[in-house]
């Protein structure tokens, strides 16, 4: 039996540009997507072993209310049916079906022992579970896949469900460190970033609802070709304007300009609200905006923004120092 841990991921800058960059395969005028992402300390802990079927179990107290143990025969037909069902285990079954189809593996039994990652909060809980399943098959059946291979399989498995997340989510495969990711059509490049000073990030689950599938569906409609000015501005926001933001963020991190980095977060959120939020009713996020503008929080932070696909999922701040970070968390 093997013990595994897969972290969630926090997108610091560049949300939605992963799938937008993929449209370069159909429209060369679209710029590559660029995002700065990092794994976080919260994640999924599990024990895995070989089995005859594909099984998911959980002992995690955090999931006891939503969890029902799952078992499926290790056949392409059964696994693909679950993947398309929209059920709680559709993501896991999507990855398992891909592994069976391309690597002719047997089954696995995955027992989640601890879950410190909130669900549906923009921290890639679905991607983390996909990476966990891919890694379990990889290690148990000695497939010799590297981290990028696990990440790609997690993405392709998730594509077998009704979800249409981009490749950015699977950055959790790289562990707890900041990376610059570039998405050029079907190609992905990952570069580790230099961070000169300690950055005191704080992120929080807003404990409200968000509809990621609706958000992604609405934002994908103006691609690959924009038809009006609003759609052109969406292309710019996820393209050239995002490139400038990423360039500044990388510079501020490398030079230790923490205050400027926080201000850039707020600037980025304002751009998102002006040009991206109007493209989907599901992006209206009253709780997020209330928290970002809370006068009690402002003296403790340099800036803040939404997380992941946005909406009322989670919020992230760059605290001024360790003491301010602790006050925010408390």
Report the location of each language-model feature:
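DPxDG-like acidic metal-binding loop motif
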Residues: 122-146
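Active-site pocket scaffolds in enzymes
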Residues: 312
């Amino acid at each position: 039996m093997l013990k595994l841990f897969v972290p969630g991921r926090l997108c610091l800058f560049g949300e939605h540009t992963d799938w937008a960059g993929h449209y370069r395969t159909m429209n060369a005028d679209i710029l590559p997507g660029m995002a700065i992402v990092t794994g976080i300390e919260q994640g999924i802990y599990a024990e895995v072993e070989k089995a005859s079927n594909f099984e998911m179990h959980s002992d995690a107290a955090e999931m006891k209310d939503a969890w029902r143990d799952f078992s499926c025969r290790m056949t392409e037909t059964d696994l693909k049916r679950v993947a398309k069902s929209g059920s709680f285990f559709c993501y896991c079954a999507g990855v398992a079906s891909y592994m069976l189809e391309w690597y002719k593996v047997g089954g696995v039994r995955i027992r989640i022992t601890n879950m410190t990652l909130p669900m549906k909060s923009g921290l890639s809980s679905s991607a983390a579970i996909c990476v966990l399943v891919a890694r379990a098959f990889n290690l148990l059946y000695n497939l010799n896949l590297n981290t990028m291979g696990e990440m790609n399989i997690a993405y392709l498995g998730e594509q077998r469900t009704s979800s249409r997340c981009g490749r950015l989510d699977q950055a959790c495969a790289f562990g707890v460190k900041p990376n610059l990711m570039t998405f050029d059509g079907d190609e992905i490049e990952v570069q580790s970033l230099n961070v000169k000073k300690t950055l005191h990030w704080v992120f929080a689950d807003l404990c409200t609802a968000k509809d990621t599938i609706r958000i992604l569906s609405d934002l994908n409609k103006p691609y690959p070709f924009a038809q009006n000015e609003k759609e052109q501005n969406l292309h710019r926001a996820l393209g050239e304007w995002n490139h400038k933001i990423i360039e500044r963020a990388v510079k501020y991190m490398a030079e230790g300009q923490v205050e400027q980095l926080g201000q850039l977060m707020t600037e980025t959120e304002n751009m998102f609200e002006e040009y991206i939020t109007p493209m989907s009713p599901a992006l209206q996020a009253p709780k997020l905006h209330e928290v970002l503008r809370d006068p009690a929080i402002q003296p403790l932070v340099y800036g803040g923004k939404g997380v992941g696909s946005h909406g009322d999922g989670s919020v992230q701040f760059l605290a001024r120092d360790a003491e301010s970070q602790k006050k925010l968390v408390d």
